Amino acid sequence: MPRNTALEKYRNIGICAHVDAGKTTTTERILFYTGLSHKIGEVHDGAATMDWMEQEQERGITITSAATTTFWSGMDQQFEKHRINIIDTPGHVDFTIEVERSLRVLDGAVVVFCGSSGVEPQSETVWRQANKYGVPRIVFVNKMDRSGADFERVCAQIKTRLKANVVPVQLNIGAEEDFKGVIDLIRMKAIMWNEEDMGLTYELVDIPADLQDRAEELRMEMIEAAAEASEELMEKYLEGGELSEDEIHQGLRARVLNNEIVLAFCGSAFKNKGVQAVLDGVVRYLPAPNQVPAIKCETEDGEPASRPSSDDAPFAALAFKLATDLFVGNLTFIRVYSGVLKSGDAVYNPVKGKKERVGRIVQMHANKRDEIKEVRAGDIAACIGLKDVTTGDTLCDQEDVVILEKMDFPEPVISVAVEPKSKADQEKMSIALGKLAAEDPSFRVKTDEESGQTIISGMGELHLDIIVDRMRREFKVEANVGNPQVAYRETIRSKVEQEAKFVRQSGGRGQYGHVFVRFEPLDEVDENGEAKVFKFVDEVVGGVVPKEYIGSVAKGIEEQLNNGVLAGYPMIGVKATLYDGSYHDVDSSEMAFKIAGSMALKEGAKKANACILEPIMKVEVVTPEDYLGDVMGDLNRRRGIIEGMDENPSGRVINALVPLAEMFGYATNVRSISQGRASFSMEFKKYAEVPNNIADEIIKSRNS
């Protein structure tokens, strides 16, 4: 069966932003203009097509990334039909994992900013993630009809706060309630959308006289940016100072694909102005699957390899999201990088070492689905019938095995105990939690060995609230939820040398392991800039500890890191160097050296000036000027350190570092201080030492 749409005409894009920048509304408008959704769903009516979980419609925020397929031929039908796969991602910081997963499988992104609030903390997180995966992007400055909206100010913020090279391709005509339309800087005409048909049609008119000069200045900057794409364009520009429309498009596209510039559009999705031009921008400037570098992967032997985006290459896809559907069971969302997959085909999962058969393949439109017979390179679809696949697994051809890069998931920072309300709920709860944990790798479940309680951990209070809410609604499990617990850690502060000997000899074969290990604080970061947990160095000379036992010593130390010496919290930031020891020809074994390693850490850490660490959150509070003093006083009482202040149209912005332990219930508190007018967001920043008096309390309560 040949392709319906050529690969060059595909666009896999994500729509990402901060909470409330108007991302879901923008997606709804895209579905309306591309003809998929005949009635526009508004978020504030709780009817948006892409927000399909009950909790999302109630809370007015997007939690899971819904994937949808749609088609676009341009505002003037100037393109051949392009197929656009859109993933709508959540903007709340507790759901960063969803954004990370989506960006991993996309080729391009539209980042939405609010015209009045501009760059917010979550925008920085999303931007960082898009940089990590090298995703080319364009910017849509939305809500230009809001009070305080200022397109050029937001572009300047993106330059300074996100260090991005922003090139506006439009200029707004009016702002706030006078927002009328946009100037297209390439055609040098004003676009006025027709309000009667919700913006389906528009007219091109002359640029208002008062904006002519500014439009010409911005146009010159844009043409310069396009000319820098190649020597030919630069020469032509230097000779005549002008480029044709096609040359401008070509130059801008080349630089967006290289992640050198970010084009800025503006409008108001809610007022049906501007989204149509963004769709043209997606087709014109964002890459097709075969215009991004071939996906990097590894062979089974760990050798680096890559897969071109082509139907003729062997099949390879990444499972980037799992969802449970009440009617069909497990849905596995996949992004196909190469090859073809037909329903009923067997696929191999090299991460699990298992072969599975794909039952059916469906194309998702938010939560409606159309069954399809096959998927090809570049497609995003959901498979039904896969049992043992988890997020981040590779599915591939068994004859040509590759492993696509694994995704790194953040460690949870907050835990609560959950108890089923009745015996009948007990079993249902463990099934429900298991399914929810399979869907969301940033959510963990474990049983506390001492108390026997079930502990769930996640990225924030809202994250866990929604998990408990989903248990109740989707799995009909009633549970009591305990107070939140902080994920404390332990570390060492000084260098110490420790001998440990594990000997059992009482006739017959005994056990013998003897090591000398140096422990010291580890101040190193990984490629994501996060602090490393553990590093093991082998400095054994002359074979005093045989090679085959060295890995066992490392393993013993690493396992012992899970039980800190002060209050039993996991230890981080430890460097261990094995430098001496001895062995016995008959009695030494891997087990004996593993136990010796764990004994060395247990004893050594006690002498190495151990301390307790707590998660510190980066908190940003936006508050009207009148409440500034009260909000800052409250942050100081919470052991917060104020790092700086900014201004934005909603008031003052306070940036602070505050221990997570002091942030429980902050949402309610800050609302009451500011009479509901302040808002805040927080994300994990780092671990830091707990003050002595608080550390004593933590140790006492853990050991009692």
UniProtKB/Swiss-Prot annotation:
Q: Which family does it belong to?
A: Belongs to the TRAFAC class translation factor GTPase superfamily. Classic translation factor GTPase family. EF-G/EF-2 subfamily.
Question: Where mainly found?
Answer: cytoplasm
Q: In this UniProt entry, which cysteines form S-S bonds? A: none
What name has this protein been given in UniProt?
A: Elongation factor G
Q: Which residues form the tr-type G domain?
A: 8-290
SUPFAM superfamilies registered for this protein in UniProt: EF-G C-terminal domain-like, P-loop containing nucleoside triphosphate hydrolases, Ribosomal protein S5 domain 2-like, Translation proteins
A GO BP term here is: ribosome disassembly
Q: Where does this one sit in the cell?
A: Cytoplasm
What cellular component GO annotations does this protein have?
Answer: cytoplasm
What InterPro entries would the database entry show? EFG_II, EFG_III, EFG_III/V, EFG_IV, EFG_V, EFG_V-like, EFTu-like_2, G_TR_CS
- State where GTP binds: 17-24, 88-92, 142-145
The UniProt record lists the keyword GTP-binding:
yes
Keywords in alphabetical order, please: Cytoplasm, Elongation factor, GTP-binding, Nucleotide-binding, Protein biosynthesis
- What organism is the protein native to? Francisella tularensis subsp. holarctica (strain FTNF002-00 / FTA)
Tell me which PANTHER family the record gives. Answer: RIBOSOME-RELEASING FACTOR 2, MITOCHONDRIAL (PTHR43261:SF1), TRANSLATION ELONGATION FACTOR G-RELATED (PTHR43261)
**Which terms does the record give in the GO molecular function aspect?**
GTP binding; GTPase activity; guanosine tetraphosphate binding; translation elongation factor activity
Described function: Catalyzes the GTP-dependent ribosomal translocation step during translation elongation. During this step, the ribosome changes from the pre-translocational (PRE) to the post-translocational (POST) state as the newly formed A-site-bound peptidyl-tRNA and P-site-bound deacylated tRNA move to the P and E sites, respectively. Catalyzes the coordinated movement of the two tRNA molecules, the mRNA and conformational changes in the ribosome.
Instruction: Say which domain of life the source belongs to.
Output: Bacteria
